[in-house]
Curated annotation (Swiss-Prot):
UniProt keyword Ligase, yes or no: yes
Main localization of the protein described in the UniProt heading: cytoplasm
GO CC terms, sorted: cytosol
EC number from the UniProt entry: 6.1.1.14
Entry protein name: Glycine--tRNA ligase beta subunit
GO MF terms, alphabetically ordered: arginine-tRNA ligase activity; ATP binding; glycine-tRNA ligase activity
Cytoplasm found in the keyword field: yes
């Protein structure tokens, strides 16, 4: 079978930088699926992505589909022919659909009967007749939230398309994609190299683009150049560059020919909190800040130019001129904001809505203040500090700095609180109230901050659920999933003695009569338990282990964590499988006898069979032994003790008829099984385990 290299390049206007990688990877994934579904053999599939192009290169692609055998089973012989042996309408219709007559059909015999059977070898089509359609199908499946039209065309894509190249070896594949006819024309860099040129063979890509067009189409290559050169540049400055992956990815998606340069700003700006300067450099300008070995910000930054200039100093000076006014603004805002105390902003919070049905930011502040104090008391943290931090929690939203540089909220609250002489734990709590902000983010670093962070999130959860605006599908405008997971992470990872049902009740109470959803507490608790399921699955715990624990509806997150770990360990014991099966059996028996009134306890005088006497004795001993373990949340030790029941339970079921005809004996045995099940349920519903 002859093979060729296949190339598709879609030349566009500037693609969304934050989506470039996902677009390219998705394009390659969907096109590979098209090839596999069409039974086209191929080698490695490589994707390329630059600001103005998406491309795929496929090695060793077969020039035609592989031949395949088509097999179709028809009606059973009994239904295929009538009593006179003539084909029925069902048989004739089936044969006609396959392009044959009934006489031409084969017979398929199995131990279940005999059927009409059709078998044919289908020759594969030439791939040059299929590729354009397959590319179009793959492009149609890209994750594009908003499509656009351009000119007078009816086609839609993420950005206007100017060139399309489809090459199989040196053969141009004819086809129209997104309204553009396939051609050999490829466009180069806007300002360097050749503006456009022709490509003769798919194997020339991407080298020809590098040599003639001055474009590095390989995304990972551009990224590695930026990382290498930026690290080297930072070392020459005696520092370390902040090369956060998200910003490096964005910059990689913005340039076709990366040239790393260094620039500086005036040292006086270092008097402004570093977070504000960094926000300007990273968020607005896409610059990489540089820190010294101790982590202090240096008056330098690294940026990536999209052009190789004969006078790089001119580019450096231009970028320094661009960033200076932004840094000067930050300096001005910082000085202006400190002319009044942070607390002086409280009245202005009354003028800003939190949510139209839930009051102002001042209302939210008052609720956070009260709830933080409530939580701090439960945690054993300083109540006065927690309420003080709650009172000041939203004041920085009214400052000039945060109004202009929104991502500095919390951080600026901390700096202004320190300037005002507030307690350090209070100041830090203002910054950390929003943590954790994303998966893997740091948790609040002190008990006061934890209390405020939990209060801030629980207030939002209770309020939004309280007016019936639950997250639906992918829509979660108030980031309730993130808030719920944040609360759970803080409580679990800091092992705090908090109950989410109790927290929700208090948070809802503080809203007074503003909430309309009467089920707000149960709704929030169920939502948070659902977050537990998703989180612990991501951590690698099995779904049935999680469900076994959730069946007990544990509302103390730290307790949930202890139970999941205990059940996970229990499953490693050799007794686990037998006891899980026994629990299923017990659960089924009790469910069928739900209307039976059980005894308050097992009656020793009614016990007859030696096996039930033994089980009752073991249960009695274990009940006394397990009580302190349950009280201290030593669930793993408790389950190890319960594992010792395996043989006794097995003997009981092997030798004893639970549903005895004597009612007194029957009820006593059901009571004993109920006590057995209740011991396991103190940890989890083991019967759920698969």
């Amino acid at each position: 079978m002859t093979t060729e290299t296949f190339l598709v390049e879609i030349g566009t206007e500037e693609l969304p930088p934050k989506a470039l990688r996902s677009l390219a990877e998705s394009f390659a994934t969907h096109f590979t699926a098209e090839l596999d579904n069409a039974n086209i053999t191929h080698g490695d599939v490589s994707w390329f992505a630059a600001p103005r192009r998406l491309a795929i290169k496929v090695a060793n692609m077969a020039k035609s589909q592989a031949d395949r055998i088509v097999e179709k089973r028809g009606p059973a012989i009994a239904q295929a022919f009538d009593a006179e042996g003539k084909p029925t309408k069902a048989a004739e219709g089936w044969a006609r659909g396959n392009g044959i007559t009934v006489d031409q059909a084969e017979r398929l015999s199995t131990d279940k009967g005999e059927w009409l059977f059709y078998r044919a070898e289908v020759k594969g089509e030439a791939v040059n007749q299929l590729l354009a359609g397959m590319v179009s199908n793959a492009l149609a499946k890209l994750p594009i939230p908003k499509l656009m039209r351009w000119g007078d065309k009816e086609t839609h894509f993420v950005r206007p398309v100017h060139t399309v190249t489809l090459l199989l070896g040196d053969t141009l594949i004819d086809g129209e994609i997104l309204g553009v006819q396939s051609a050999r024309i490829i466009r180069g860099h806007r300002f360097m190299g050749e503006a456009e040129f022709t490509i003769d063979n798919a194997d020339q890509y991407p080298e020809i683009l590098y040599e003639r067009g001055k474009v590095i189409a390989d995304y990972e290559n551009r990224k590695s150049i930026i990382l290498h050169d930026a690290r080297l540049a930072a070392e020459k400055l005696g520092g370390v560059a902040d090369l956060s992956d998200s910003l490096v990815e964005e910059v990689t998606s913005l340039v076709e020919w990366p040239v790393v340069l260094t620039a500086k700003f005036e040292e006086k700006f270092l008097e402004v909190p570093a977070e504000a300067l960094v926000y300007t450099m990273k968020g607005d300008q896409k610059y990489f800040p540089v820190y010294d070995k101790q982590g202090a910000l240096l008056p330098h930054f690294i940026f990536v130019s999209n052009i190789e200039s004969s006078d790089p100093q001119q580019i450096i000076s231009g970028n320094e001129k661009v960033v200076r006014p932004r840094l000067a603004d930050a300096e001005f805002f910082f000085k202006t904001d400190r002319k009044q105390r942070l607390e002086d902003n409280l009245p202005r919070l009354e003028t800003v809505l939190f949510q139209k049905n839930l009051g102002s930011l001042r209302d939210k502040t008052d609720r956070i203040q009260a709830l933080a104090g409530f939580i701090a008391e439960k945690m054993g943290a300083d109540v006065n500090k927690a309420t003080r931090a709650g009172l000041l929690s939203k004041c920085d939203l009214m400052t000039n700095m945060v109004f202009e540089f929104t991502d500095t909220q919390g951080v600026m609250g901390m700096h202004y609180a320190r300037h005002d002489g507030e307690d350090e734990e209070v100041a830090v709590a203002l910054k950390e109230q929003y943590q954790p902000r994303f998966a893997g983010d740091a948790l609040p670093s002190n008990p006061v901050a934890s209390a405020v962070a939990i209060a801030e999130k629980m207030d939002t959860l209770a309020g939004i659920f309280g007016i019936g605006q639950h997250p639906k599908g992918d829509k979660d405008p108030f980031a309730l999933r993130r808030a719920a997971l944040g609360v759970l992470r803080i409580i679990v990872e800091q092992d705090l003695p908090l109950d989410i049902e109790e927290l929700t009740q208090e948070a809802a109470r503080l809203y007074g009569d503003k909430l309309t959803n009467q089920n707000v507490v149960s709704d929030v608790v169920e939502f948070m338990l659902g977050r537990f399921r998703a989180w612990y699955q991501e951590l690698g715990y099995s779904i049935d282990t999680i469900q076994a624990v959730l069946a007990r509806r544990p509302t103390q997150p730290a307790d949930f964590n202890a139970r999941v770990k205990a059940v996970t360990y229990f499953r490693t014991l050799e007794e686990a499988a037998a006891l899980a099966e026994a629990n299923k059996r017990v659960s089924n028996i009790l469910a069928k006898s739900a209307d039976v009134k059980l005894n308050d306890k097992v009656l020793a005088s009614v016990l007859k069979a030696p096996e039930e006497v033994q089980l009752a004795a073991n249960l009695s001993v274990l009940q006394d032994k397990l009580a302190p373990l349950f009280a201290e949340r030593k669930y793993q030790e408790a389950l190890v003790e319960l594992a010792s029941l395996r043989d006794v339970v097995n003997n009981f079921f092997d030798k004893v008829m639970v549903m005895d005809k004597d009612e007194e004996i029957r009820v006593n045995r059901l009571t004993m099984l109920h006590e057995l099940r209740e011991l396991f349920l103190k940890v989890a519903d083991i019967s759920v385990l698969q």
